[in-house]
Amino acid sequence: MKRPADVTLGIDLANRTGICKIEWGSTSATITRLDVVQDITTEKGWDIVKQAVVEAHKNGWWVGIDAPFGFPEAFGQSVEALRDPTGKTSGSPHTFSQAPFSDARVWRATEKITKDASGIDHLSSTVTNQITGHVINCDDLRYEVIGRARNWADGRLGCTTGIVEVYPAAALKIWEAPVGKYKTNQVDLCGLVKWLFRSMSVSWLQFSTGGGGLKWKLLRTLMSKDDAFDALICALIARLASLPGGPTCPYHHTFTPAQMDLFRSEGWIHLPPLAPTLCYLDPANIPYIGQCPQCGG
């Protein structure tokens, strides 16, 4: 049976990327890194993100990334068909029954499940220009870190690689967070931070007290950068995914083999339990859900 991650890394992957590192002890968890890479379209910016994920994987940490791990299967089939107009390998793009922007081509199966659970519409990886590029960036990143040989079949599920897809907006909705317009309104962002630390009973979550006023630097970053806050949520869900029993793992649901194959191809969003509480993340009270026979959790 796997043990919970001692360290988790949260990556809010976007042009301006938030990074959060949490170190987990037996009774508390400490935020030791919280920063924002201003522009990952530059070589320097991308290297910072890549090095963080490479270090995490090398050390056996769990990583939660807010970015789609794949495209809808029907969309991929359409692209393959366009590259082969003879239809010998995948059929003509015009033979598909779906309309050009039908659900099957626009939304991944995991996004539909996420919407049912949280009521939140995920940004489409195929019709949202800003997201499409990050799907490719994320796949390049996971390929460089994991490689094709090691657990590639389950690579988009994350259950065996320790690199999981997360969606902070859905998690916050499940937790009934007062999100307001925190992406654009700093007052709402500060209110969201206060809600997390005061209303959700996370007294076990603290800031590093390292030298140079690190605690206050971390807190200021969290209160002023929505990317940093999202990265923190990513790191929290990464810890949840690492818990014994793999509570976020799709193997713990009653999906068919065909559905699991679809998740392996398109990706799987790891969601918290459908309850407005974070008690299951308390290091002093780790829940045991039962060992997963598939992923070994």
Where are these regions (language model features)?
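RNase H-like (RuvC/DEDD) metal-dependent nuclease/polynucleotide-processing core
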Residues: K2-L9, L13-G296
